[in-house]
Amino acid sequence: KKQIMLVGGRFSGFLAEYLAAHLRLLRPGISVVGHDELSRATAVADANRQTVLVVFDYRRYTVWAEHLAQTVQAQGATVCLMTDVWLSPIARTSSVVLPCPVESPSPFDSITAATAVVESLIAAVTEQLGEHGKRRVALAEGILRDA
């Protein structure tokens, strides 16, 4: 079974955490790569052909995220990129690229469209896993309720 690692930037890290929280309920093998050097180093050490790295990289692209993506890909991992319409440099080598608009009337980019893409991914994974995923969610929710 694939190991899924997720990583995001200053603001998009929220999206990585949000997707990871849902995926953890649905299946094992989910981790979020922290922004610190140790987290990135151990992510690289753990990466192999069974790894999928989901990178959230939007305008003001993150240099360390690009390096992380290139390094794990060199070890056989698959890279899936969530980015804006201008495309992060990581797009050049990613197996999957999911761009979305980020324009906003404020000085900050909007994550509204990106959140919708994440919600769609959660729905697709839930459907793909079928009853197994639903049973796992029910079990986890039961454990959380009883805690």
Task: List where the protein language model places each region.
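Glycine-rich phosphate-binding loops that contact phosphosugars or nucleotide phosphates
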Residues: 2-116, 123-127
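Internal, active-site/partner-interface "lid" segment
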Residues: 128-147
